[in-house]
């Protein structure tokens, strides 16, 4: 059964763009702020990062989700629009943008041949776009959005239920998990680089 989860976040941080880029380019550091992420590692031989997440199904049975992603960076064209992301199309740049950079975590087109040790382990797909906009007063506006897709099998007796009901239940849980993870990561960003709480918003949604 395939389920999809999505989340969006925006924040104004009291940090110069150059410092913000260094912070958000630290792939391992950012992912370790996610309370459901148990491991992040760079597979040098394959040129990809491996994420390992641990969640529970509706009956509290553990599920291990593994993702393989590549990290890319690109400059934002001030004469153009915000680069399209996994959840949104191109849109105008935030008012007052002086410069910007976009960091992407893109699902690897090829799954590396690595051993998956945990039981009930499933390989998913993940795509993230982090846009960083340099504003005045040494501030950076951050637009963070991500979506994940996971195709997995549920244990008995859940697998005896109608799939449409299972899908609804599972995606509701996925939505809750991603909302909690987004809020947790934003709180950690706030702690690390003095994020302005009054200008921080987060939202999660499901399909």
Where are these regions (language model features)?
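Hydrophobic ligand-binding cavity/cleft-lining segments
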Residues: 1-77, 81-87, 93
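Context-gated lysine
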Residues: 6-10, 32, 44, 101, ...
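A broadly tuned preference for mixed-charge, low-complexity surface segments
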Residues: 57-71, 132-134, 191-206
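Beta-strand/loop substructures that line and gate deep hydrophobic ligand-binding cavities in soluble
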Residues: 81-172
């Amino acid at each position: 059964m395939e389920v999809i989860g999505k989340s969006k976040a925006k924040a104004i941080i009291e940090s110069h763009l150059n410092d913000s880029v260094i912070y958000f380019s630290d792939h391992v550091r950012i992912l370790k702020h996610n309370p459901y992420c148990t491991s992040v590692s760079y597979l040098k031989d394959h040129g990809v990062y491996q994420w390992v997440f641990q969640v529970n199904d509706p009956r509290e049975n553990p599920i291990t989700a593994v993702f393989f992603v590549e990290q890319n960076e690109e400059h934002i064209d001030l004469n153009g629009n915000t680069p399209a992301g996994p959840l949104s199309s191109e849109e105008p740049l935030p008012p007052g943008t002086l410069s910007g950079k976009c960091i992407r975590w893109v699902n690897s087109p090829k799954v590396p041949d690595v051993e998956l040790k945990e039981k009930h382990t499933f390989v998913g797909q993940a795509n993230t776009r982090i846009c960083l906009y340099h504003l005045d007063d040494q501030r950076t506006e951050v637009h963070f959005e991500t979506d994940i897709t996971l195709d997995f099998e549920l244990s008995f007796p859940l697998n005896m239920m109608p799939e449409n009901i299972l899908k609804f239940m599972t995606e509701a849980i996925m939505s809750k998990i991603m909302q909690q993870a987004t809020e947790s990561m934003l709180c950690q960003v706030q702690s690390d680089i003095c994020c302005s709480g009054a200008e921080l918003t987060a939202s999660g949604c499901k399909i």
